[in-house]
Swiss-Prot record:
Name of the protein in question: UDP-N-acetylmuramoyl-L-alanyl-D-glutamate--2,6-diaminopimelate ligase
Alphabetical list of InterPro entries matching this protein: Mur-like_cat_sf, Mur_ligase_C, Mur_ligase_C_dom_sf, Mur_ligase_cen, Mur_ligase_N, MurE/MurF_N, UDP-N-AcMur-Glu-dNH2Pim_ligase
Subcellular location: Cytoplasm
EC number annotated for this UniProt entry: 6.3.2.13
Binding site for meso-2,6-diaminopimelate: 385, 409-412, 476, 480
Natural source organism: Geobacter metallireducens (strain ATCC 53774 / DSM 7210 / GS-15)
GO biological process: cell division; cell wall organization; peptidoglycan biosynthetic process; regulation of cell shape
């Protein structure tokens, strides 16, 4: 693609050098630049891409997009813009032929529920006969091709390249999780969304965003800017959970028609006569398409909201009631989201990604609704992340569990013991009994907590303490198959660990 064609998309305020250049690739990492590349000098928190312009030229970049042209070496073509990230997002879409044009694209954002909602929307669209590609927290997938997801939302060049590849393979629709980081950093500005879905907003990522209002403003961009109708997609929709206070705010600011969902009688999509059990959720959906009876194998009230989000997205896309019902009633299995781990000890073992206070509370409330025995929770908090949520999560675990075992999550470069100490501050505020690990081996008779730094040992202890009828919840890591200690990733999978713990107990004739 010629630089002059990209320049029409980027719309630079100034330019220097020849625009009659053939561009072979787009890059924002100088180490990846190849011959004929266009380099985008992005300013980041820790680095400034302007410092790597010379390195990009030496690796073959023929032009550079900058915010400060004084940093460009003599003889190199440059384009000056106010926002290099926005320019890269638009250029990436054009370079890869605007792959989101002409197909339905659903973007899902919010603190909790994005991944499950993505799976549900995928199922609804697939039931409508649309071959769907999915870009999510867990994986990017289409058909029989699945690749692990390095980020919730990749950088704009990687995103557009991936979507182009998926469309070329036959995808006729795209469902993607859209993170607050991606919205703030303009990674998805080159995508043309048909539907945006807002699930909820609770405390998270405050290590990156200054405060909750900044976090909200990042999420809101999808609805206040990116859903504006244009010639390519004149009919767009904002699907919003208006039971959430931030969602209610967003509904009044959205630039697209709103399809509201929730449990209040005034919303467009809601559920009535709902029952929750170990078998799932049953009830009646009330929609603009009429009432739809349903049963889902998913568990809990928060998953009811995820179901409603998917139903509302189906309504917004103009899909049939049969497709909507068929999608949500299908065998939707979401890795690490209240995922069951089978065992022969009569214990309900659930693995969940809940890593915020709100998510943990939702999961534990769900467990409490279906549990017939005690609730044992094993969890920790990630290092180099928002410290403020640690005591909050500790207090929540202590309040809703019969036994909380606090352990390491991904400590990263922090001391695992120090993180555990901050979590324990929240639990101790409840005045619960503190158990030693050795003491728990013989069981426990009063609501309480313990600290075991090794996650493997914490899981083994929980398996040993649990008895038939109990629910054992392993929270925080979910689908992850690694643990980050220092700067190194080590293989670690909660599902594998708890299964191994029960096998060991069986081999010893225990349980």
């Amino acid at each position: 693609m010629r630089l002059e064609d990209l320049a029409r998309v980027i719309n630079p305020s100034e330019a220097g050098g020849s625009l009659a250049l053939e561009i072979e690739g787009l890059y924002c990492d100088s180490r990846q630049v190849r011959s004929g590349g266009l380099f985008f000098a992005l300013r980041g928190v820790a680095t400034d891409g302007h410092d790597y312009i010379v390195a990009s030229r030496d690796r073959g970049a023929v032009a550079v997009v900058v915010e400060d042209p004084s940093r460009v070496p003599e003889g190199m073509t440059w384009l000056k813009v106010d926002d290099a990230r926005l320019a890269m997002s638009r250029a990436a879409a054009a370079f890869y032929g605007n792959p989101t044009d002409g197909i339905p694209v659903v973007g899902i954002t919010g603190t909790n529920g994005k991944t499950t909602t993505t799976y549900l929307v995928e199922a609804v669209m697939a039931r409508a006969g649309i071959p769907v590609a999915v870009l999510g927290t867990i994986s990017y997938r289409f058909g029989d091709k699945t690749i692990p997801a390095p980020h919730t939302t990749p950088e704009s060049v990687d995103l557009q390249r991936t979507i182009r590849d998926l469309v070329d393979r036959g995808a006729q629709g795209v469902v993607m999780e859209v993170s607050s980081h991606a919205l703030e950093q303009r990674r998805v500005d080159g995508c043309r969304f048909d539907v945006g879905v807002f699930t909820n907003l609770t405390r998270d990522h405050l290590d990156y965003h200054r405060d909750m209002e900044s976090y909200f403003e990042s999420k809101a961009r999808l609805f206040t800017e990116l859903l504006a109708a244009d010639d390519t997609k004149p009919r767009r929709a904002a699907v919003i959970n208006v039971d959430d206070p931030y969602g209610a705010r967003l509904a009044s600011d959205a630039v697209a028609p709103v399809v509201s969902y929730g449990l209040s009688p005034s919303v467009m999509v809601r559920a009535e006569m709902v029952t929750f059990s170990v078998d799932g959720i049953s009830g009646t959906l009330v929609t603009p398409l009429g009432t739809i009876p349903f049963h889902s194998r998913l568990l809990g009230r928060f998953n009811l909201y995820n179901i409603l989000a998917a139903v509302a997205a189906g309504v917004a896309l103009g899909l049939s009631p049969d497709a909507i019902r068929g999608g949500i009633e299908g065998d939707v299995r979401v890795p690490g989201r209240l995922e069951r781990v089978d065992n022969d000890h009569g214990i309900t073992v659930l693995v969940d990604y809940a890593h915020t206070g709100d998510a943990l509370e939702n999961v534990l409330k769900t467990v409490a609704e279906i549990a017939t025995g005690r609730i044992i929770t094993v969890f920790g908090c990630g290092g180099d992340r928002d410290r403020g949520k640690r005591p909050v999560m500790g207090e929540i675990a202590g309040r809703f569990s019969d036994l909380s075992i606090v352990t390491s999550d991904n400590p990263r470069t922090e001391d695992a013991g120090a993180i555990i100490g901050e979590i324990l501050g929240g639990i101790r505020s409840l005045g619960l009994r503190e158990y030693g690990a050795e003491e728990l081996i013989t069981g426990f008779d009063a609501k309480g907590f313990a600290a075991v730094e090794s996650r493997r040992e914490a899981i083994r202890l929980a398996a040993r303490v649990a008895r038939p009828g109990d629910v054992l919840l392993l929270a925080g890591k979910g689908h992850e198959d690694y643990q980050i200690i220092g700067t190194m990733k080590h293989h670690f999978d909660d599902r594998e660990e708890v299964a191994a713990a029960f096998r060991e107990l069986s081999s010893k004739g225990q349980g």
